[in-house]
Amino acid sequence: MKRTTLAAAAAALMATAAGQHQQDSCYLFAFFSNNTPDGEQVRYALSDDGLNYTSLNGGRPVVASDTIALKKSIRDPYICRGRDGRTFYMVMTDMRSSEGWQSNDGLILMKSDDLLHWQHTAIDFPTRFPSLEGFGRDNLHAVWAPQLIWDAREGRYMIYYSIGRHDWEYPVGDKRQPYFKLFYSYVNDDFTDITEPRLLFDFGTAAIDGDIIYDGRNGEYVLFFKDEGLPTVNNGFRTRQGVMRATAKELTGPYATEFRHLQKPGQYPVEGSSVFRLIGSDDYILMYDCYAQGYYQFCRSSDLKNFTFVQNTPTRGTFTPRHGSVMHISAAERDRLEAWSALAVAIDALERRPAPTLTLRQLDGRRKLLDEARATLAATADAKRLRKMAARVEGF
């Protein structure tokens, strides 16, 4: 396929997205919360402006990690809407940080038609690619932060992620410094498997947390990533461990890097960048996790090149996000999520409510109601049914 055809295909995809954006109502943020097993689970939050978010389900997980991950914990969820407008995809790191930062060998693929009930597949790289040189369990130590993008040339989704291997490490004093490169694969139509990894981007030092978006105005793909090299400080500001930008005419590269950090200057490291378009606007938000400081930082751009600081959004209360991603959802999808959340919160409240004065008959009635409510929560995404059941639980 010629490049002009690819450009036309990419433009068509942007036109489709523009058409769908007429139904966009708000922003859904999918994230994990902290470095504990409870925190390393998928959580949701909603926003009307893309900057200020309110947690769903009282800040509790939406998807339980022990039901989807080989490590029983996840990190770095990336969520997006499929090209058909009705299917949703989520990919994430299969990792438990308490086992160490060099302990993860895989990622998770998830697919849903309602944002609540997901089919899932865990991909363990040493098992899936046993004959691939350098990807054995004794050498591979990181498969981090997967994300998705549609490849018009291939006609399928490309998944890309950071790989860390022991044979790439280099000595620094009496220690060895990790080295990461970005790789990519293609996902099958069932969203249950990936092709053999291929090199996407080698920065020349460690690079993680890739995020690619197509810029139709300039006919190029823009890759945002974290410079994970050893930090140095110049006049109080870090010259490493910030968000950088690279561009390419083809999705799989080669990418040319601009050697400057995009985030607001500071002495603290950042990671987990994610770019999304503002609803009803041609402007974009670049957000990233200021993980050492306890807030997310948001910057705005009209050209995906020059960014202006907007605000720091504190992580507090039930909203305590770490590396995640944002997508647009419709009013109906929001209603569904809020109805599901209302029932989940009501169930939790009733389970926790002391019942020392209840009769045996009342206790049996509560047990049956909770069983029915949990079954409804697990089986349906119908907002009316969810709200009706929530009202029954709240009224008990």
Where does each model-flagged region fall?
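Sec-dependent signal peptide recognition
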Residues: 2-8
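Carbohydrate-active catalytic/glycan-binding domains of CAZyme proteins
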Residues: 20-349
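Charged, amphipathic alpha-helical scaffolding segments
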Residues: 379-387
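Hydrophobic h-region of N-terminal signal peptides that target proteins for export
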Residues: 10-18
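Amphipathic, heptad-repeat alpha-helical segments
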Residues: 339-380, 395-396
